[in-house]
């Protein structure tokens, strides 16, 4: 008679144990559900640390990568042509005139267009006796205020790049890596010859022409360019390895 009673008690024990397991969902090791077992304080601190680390590793970008990619690859010919033509005219104007003259002429041209259109619409409304109102009212009503959140996002994005640049400058000028510092020295030495031939505006014009032309050429001849770039990279790597092997400090660091 004792066996049936034990048999009747075992389902209750198993159901209670399963109920205890179901009361702690996700209780596996390493799962988020393990937080209740760690306590409220430790769980909150660990969750906060993980949130901070994940958010800090994803900085806000000032520009969308896809938009820049579409712009330099001429996905929208009208938009790219407008940007390319406007910036090229600006740079050519700065090459011929001073910055003050270029800015003044641009403002005068813009004011000439807007004032002429405003006077024209006023005369038309007076002749037709219509009440259309201000011709630029739709644009005047547009909210262009910058929110504090958006401002802080842009500042944070800029600070990421500034801090990265400062670390790189310190690393190069304090010779953390001798080869990288020598590369900078050789590059600056070559730039002295470039600066003797071209001024800053000319270099900007050439840079714009390259930015808006090289991506198209690369997209068209990608296979051939990748082949020759790979050969040049291998040769450069072998030369750098030979130089590093002859430098005692670098060779000792590699051996360690």
Curated annotation (Swiss-Prot):
Entry's Gene Ontology cellular component terms: endoplasmic reticulum; endoplasmic reticulum membrane; Golgi apparatus; Golgi membrane
Lineage of the species this protein comes from: Eukaryota, Metazoa, Chordata, Craniata, Vertebrata
Species of the source: Bos taurus (Bovine)
PROSITE patterns (UniProt xref): RETICULON
Protein name: Reticulon-3
Coiled coil: none
Cytoplasmic side: 2-87, 112-171, 193-196, 218-256
Region (Interaction with FADD): 211-256
Residue positions where N-acetylalanine is found in the record: 2
Subunit structure: Homodimer. Interacts with RTN4. Interacts with BACE1, BACE2, BCL2 and FADD. Interacts with ATL1 and ATL2. Interacts with TMEM33. Interacts with ZFYVE27 and with KIF5A in a ZFYVE27-dependent manner. Interacts with RIGI. Interacts with TRIM25.
């Amino acid at each position: 008679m004792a066996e049936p009673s034990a048999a009747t008690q075992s389902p209750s024990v198993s159901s209670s144990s399963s109920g205890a397991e179901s009361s702690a969902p996700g209780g596996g090791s390493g799962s988020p559900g393990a937080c209740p077992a760690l306590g409220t304080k430790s769980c909150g601190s660990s969750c906060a640390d993980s949130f901070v680390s994940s958010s800090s590793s994803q900085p806000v970008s000032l520009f969308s990568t896809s938009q820049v990619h579409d712009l330099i690859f001429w996905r929208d010919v009208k938009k790219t042509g407008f940007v390319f033509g406007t910036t090229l005219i600006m740079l050519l104007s700065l090459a011929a005139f001073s910055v003050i003259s270029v800015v003044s002429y641009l403002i005068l041209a813009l004011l000439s267009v807007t004032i002429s259109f405003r006077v024209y619409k006023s005369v038309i409304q007076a002749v037709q006796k219509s009440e259309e109102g201000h011709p630029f009212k739709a644009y005047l009503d547009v909210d262009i205020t910058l929110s504090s959140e958006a401002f802080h996002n842009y500042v944070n994005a800029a600070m990421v790049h500034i801090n990265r640049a400062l670390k790189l400058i310190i690393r190069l000028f304090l010779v953390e890596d001798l080869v990288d510092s020598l590369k900078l020295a050789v590059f600056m030495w070559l730039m002295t010859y470039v600066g003797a031939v071209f001024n800053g505006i000319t270099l900007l014009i050439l840079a714009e022409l390259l930015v808006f032309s090289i991506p198209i050429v690369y997209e068209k001849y990608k296979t051939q360019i990748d082949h020759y770039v790979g050969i040049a990279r291998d040769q450069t790597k072998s030369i750098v390895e030979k130089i590093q092997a002859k430098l005692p400090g670098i060779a000792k660091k590699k051996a360690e």
